[in-house]
Regions:
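Extracytosolic ligand-binding ectodomains
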Residues: 4-10, 19-370
């Protein structure tokens, strides 16, 4: 509790130091340390770029936008305290919160923002628990993580049909376990439950070498790795040391760049799943070209941080107001402009979740295979 209290005091001082002007504020709640620091930095880069664009063009509805970056510590009690601290700031309007990145105490966090009438956008795909939370000013911009399971199965069925698949997850991480269950459910739906099996890191007390041996002795020829970046890179290395030809799939954002440093040449041949292919996306082409010409290159999740701000900007322009109720009302419009084309939203989520692309990594290059 002492640690939580000290964190809240530091957060309060950080927020108040940013509250010296009459502008409106956009807050990003994303990790600044530990396993998810890369994801946080990427989101920060995209959000800041979008805000800078708005301000350089004269602001929004006559106001400049201030940016406040808040650490998401991926902790249940701190997640709620962070939301409460942002909600009580009256000196300067916090009109939008992007995040949090982690799903800790998600329903409570969303409640806090809804009661404070602060619009909230989740810039990444959400899991089953988050999907159940519905608020009129809560946007799940990309839809649901079970889309990853659907796209994985489609590629598996066309390329590796018949291979036995190990899904290896972190039993202490609710999000990882929900993603694992989505994969199992997708195979069951298609009558292929016999070829997929769930393993968790704790069944061998996090002895990755023993788990790699068990997985392959069970006859599995490929694995989908879930969990923290540390879980993923350690498991991948042990699987490849046991058998260099073992097929590995994982989520590119979850694995992050530490994967390549840790595995070296053993990383070759890994399949990475990433939200929607960029190269052949006509809706994004104009935006990407414009930004590249200005010297800005998207990295990882930066595109989704940028897109969250632009989505909110479009809703504010439609509403001609920053007010929560007026902005929220336009989520029911038939066509909402996003960086991915016009979308229809239902209960704050797009009617069709963003799909995933699959890339095979080889010799420091990504080759799109799906």
């Amino acid at each position: 509790m002492r640690y939580v209290f000290l964190y809240i005091i530091c957060l309060f001082l950080t927020i108040n130091s940013a509250l010296a002007t009459p502008n409106v504020t956009v807050a990003l709640v994303a990790p600044k340390a530990e396993e998810y620091i890369q994801q946080g930095e990427e989101l920060n880069k995209g959000v800041k770029r979008a805000i800078d664009e708005i301000n350089n063009e004269g602001g929004l509805l006559g106001k400049k936008i201030d940016f406040l970056a808040v650490d998401d510590q991926c902790n249940d009690s701190i997640a709620v305290s962070t939301a409460q601290m942002l909600a009580v700031q009256k000196e300067k309007q916090i009109v939008l919160v992007i995040g949090p990145y982690c799903a800790n105490s998600f329903d409570q966090v969303a409640d806090v923002y809804a009661h404070a009438k602060i619009f909230q956008i989740i810039p990444t795909a959400v899991n089953y628990t988050q999907a159940k939370t519905i608020k009129k000013g809560l946007v799940k911009m990309l839809g649901y993580t079970n889309q990853e399971a659907k796209d994985f199965f489609n590629y598996y069925n066309s390329t590796f049909a018949g291979n036995k698949v190990a899904v290896i997850s972190n039993s202490n991480d609710a999000e990882s376990m929900e993603e694992a269950q989505a994969l199992i459910n997708e195979f069951q739906k298609h009558g292929k439950s016999v070829v997929i099996k769930l393993y968790t890191y704790d069944i061998t007390n996090k002895d990755y070498e023993a788990l790699a041996e068990l997985v392959q002795k069970d006859g599995n020829e490929m694995a989908f790795l879930l969990g923290t970046a540390k879980n993923i890179r350690k498991m991948a290395r042990r699987l490849r040391e046991y058998n260099e030809k073992f097929i590995i799939f994982t989520n590119k954002y979850a694995a992050n760049n530490s994967y390549f440093d840790y595995l070296g040449s053993l990383a070759d041949g890994t399949y990475f799943m990433e939200l929607r292919g960029r190269n052949d996306d006509p809706e994004l082409a104009e935006t990407l070209v414009k930004l590249r010409l200005s010297g800005f290159e998207f990295e990882g999740l930066s595109l989704y941080g940028y897109s969250a701000v632009k989505l909110w900007e479009n809703l504010v322009k439609k509403a001609k107001s920053f007010e929560y109720d007026k902005v929220s009302a336009h989520l029911n419009d038939k066509n909402i402009k996003t960086e991915f084309g016009n979308k229809m939203f239902h209960n704050g989520a797009p009617k069709v979740s963003e799909s995933y692309a699959i890339y095979r990594y080889e010799d420091e290059n990504y080759v799109k295979v799906y």
